């Protein structure tokens, strides 16, 4: 019997919505006959997360009561904790053409593929600004990429249970790293792990990430380096490059069999504290008992305080999650200490510290600069330098307060 933390929800069982075998073949044929609802890249990635059971216990895209409950008090209509709305929008003409309980095919527009079907049980409109203020803590569509996506949603939300018929390109393009929750749980069980810490990544690992990871390795049975292979914002490093960079780091600087690397298909929302909670929910579904929450988790720009994503775990209803946050303070290289340290372990001043950030790594390398040796391992830097050298078009990367340390610790 598994010793891992059970999945999220009342039933404490994974709820994958991805069809297999004869049911899959039949649904694929049926989908060809249905009205088509186009999905954005975020909606498509959410559908795949539903399919693999990462969004257990959801059975589809949310209706109005769940949307409102999640925005206002982190709970769905049935009382189950959930931090961010998972919704599907359609333009009014498409929505008007769909009858109640009619089945529709869900099209991933970017990849021109039908990923699933949905029985439309509800159609409703939302206050987009209310969602943005609740989830992102801002309505700044010009500066915040997550807000911009919500404000660009179509006029009507469609809700109902889904059946997923494809995981898109993820299983083939990322075949050595992409995992479903059931697959990760099987790997953890085979190793006899019970206490597993997840390290959320959307950047290649620099020395601060490595430091966080090794703290977890010291106190847990194992570490799950779980990186996003879904869509990021412009200027972020692509998943295949990150996978390669993490591989060389784990191979050269971690004890064998203490770390598993995995990938998941969600798209970043950059919702900071609320997204940290979503990361916690689906990491619990993957079998992780803990989530490492460091500085500026899932943030963008200066919209959130550096530790707001840690504080929010203290504000949610008691018992909402079985997974626990592993909260870690500012980490940096201290020249006086002679290595990596944190605010809790280093007594020295700012002048003695080199703050490390993914943004700084990307900016320096994209401009052809040399990173200080304290920033990242040479094997990792080599992978990243090769990537940036091959770019035909350079992307401007702006530094923000959380990347430079010029923020007040709230």
Curated annotation (Swiss-Prot):
Q: In which pathway does it act?
A: Sulfur metabolism; hydrogen sulfide biosynthesis; sulfite from sulfate: step 1/3
Catalysed conversion reaction: sulfate + ATP + H(+) = adenosine 5'-phosphosulfate + diphosphate
Question: Which keywords does this Swiss-Prot/TrEMBL entry list?
Answer: ATP-binding, Nucleotide-binding, Nucleotidyltransferase, Transferase
Q: Which InterPro entries match?
A: ATP-Sase_PUA-like_dom, PUA-like_sf, Rossmann-like_a/b/a_fold, SO4_adenylyltransferase_pro, Sulfurylase_cat_dom, Sulphate_adenylyltransferase
Record carries keyword Thylakoid: no
Which BP terms does GO give this entry? hydrogen sulfide biosynthetic process; sulfate assimilation
The Swiss-Prot or TrEMBL record describes its family as follows: Belongs to the sulfate adenylyltransferase family.
Question: Entry's HAMAP family?
Answer: Sulf_adenylyltr (MF_00066)
Q: Which PANTHER family match?
A: PTHR43509, SULFATE ADENYLYLTRANSFERASE (PTHR43509:SF1)
Protein name in UniProt: Sulfate adenylyltransferase
